[in-house]
A protein has these predicted regions:
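Class I SAM-binding transferase module
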Residues: 2-198, 202-222
Length: 222
C-alpha cells in the first residue's frame, strides 16, 4: 500500500475514482489528497468520480428522549441547582460535539436545509475553502435549538446521490454526522438564526468554533 501523495505513474490517467469522503466531508483530507492526484496524474479533461459535494451545517432539535443537557442547564434535580457549574464549562470542541449515525437522534431541522459550501473537485483548491462561514436560517419548524448538525451530500451523477443526513432514511449507513452542541434555546416560528462557523483546519473538527444567534425569541449561543 502507498499513500496517494506518494503514487507516481508513467503516464496520466483518464479517471480518478476515489472514496476519500469523510463523515463531515473534509475530515479524511479529501480535498488536498484528490487535488494532488488531479494536478499530477489526471489527463486534461479527465474525470473525477465523485466530484460534486455539498456541505451542510443546520440548526436542529433533537428527539426529547435523546437530548442530553449540559450539567449547568439542570437547575432543579431533586432540589439541586447545578447552574453555577457553567463557570467551569470546558470550551474544547470534543466536549461540545458528538458523532452519530443513528437516525433517531435528530428530530428536525429548524429551517430549510441548504448547502453552505459546494465543492467541485475538478476546480477546487485547498486554499479556496473558506475558513469562516456565516449564514442565516428562518425558523419554519419551531423547537428547541440543541445545536448544529453537520453532514454532506455527494452527487455521483444525475441519478445517484449519497448522503449522511440524519433525516435521510436511505443515507449511507457507514457515514456519521456531527452535532455541534449549543446551550438550549426555545425557538418560535419566524425567528431568525444567525450562524457562524470558524475553522482552522477543515480536516480536524476539533479546530472548529461556532456560534448561533437567535433573534426574535432567544439569546446568543456559543
Amino acid at each position: 500500500d502507498v499513500h496517494s501523495t506518494k503514487l507516481y505513474l508513467d503516464e496520466p490517467v483518464d479517471l480518478i475514482l476515489h472514496e476519500q469522503i469523510g463523515d463531515f466531508l473534509f475530515d479524511e483530507a479529501m480535498v488536498p489528497n484528490v487535488c494532488d492526484l488531479r494536478d499530477r496524474l489526471l489527463k486534461p479533461g479527465g474525470l473525477i468520480l465523485p466530484s460534486q459535494f455539498e456541505f451542510y451545517c443546520e440548526p436542529m432539535t433533537m428527539h426529547d428522549d435523546r437530548r442530553e443537557p449540559y450539567i449547568w442547564e439542570l437547575d432543579d434535580v431533586y432540589g439541586f441547582d447545578f447552574s453555577s457549574m457553567e463557570r467551569s464549562r470546558p470550551y474544547d470542541a470534543e466536549y461540545n460535539g458528538l458523532v452519530s449515525c443513528d437516525l433517531g437522534v435528530v428530530k428536525h431541522f429548524l429551517g430549510e436545509a441548504e448547502p453552505v459550501i459546494k465543492v467541485d473537485l475538478n476546480t477546487v483548491t485547498e486554499s479556496s475553502l473558506p475558513l469562516k462561514i456565516s449564514f442565516s436560517r428562518k425558523v419554519v419548524n419551531p423547537g428547541i435549538l440543541d445545536g448544529l448538525v453537520v453532514f454532506m451530500k455527494a452527487k455521483v451523477d444525475d441519478d445517484l446521490e449519497l448522503s449522511s443526513s440524519p433525516l435521510d432514511s436511505k443515507r449511507a449507513p457507514h457515514w456519521g454526522f456531527r452535532i455541534l452542541r449549543l446551550d438550549q434555546v426555545d425557538t418560535e416560528l419566524g425567528d431568525d438564526l444567525e450562524v457562524t462557523l470558524r475553522v482552522k483546519d477543515w480536516a480536524d473538527p476539533e479546530t472548529w468554533r461556532w456560534t448561533c444567534g437567535v433573534w426574535g425569541g432567544g439569546d446568543l449561543n456559543e
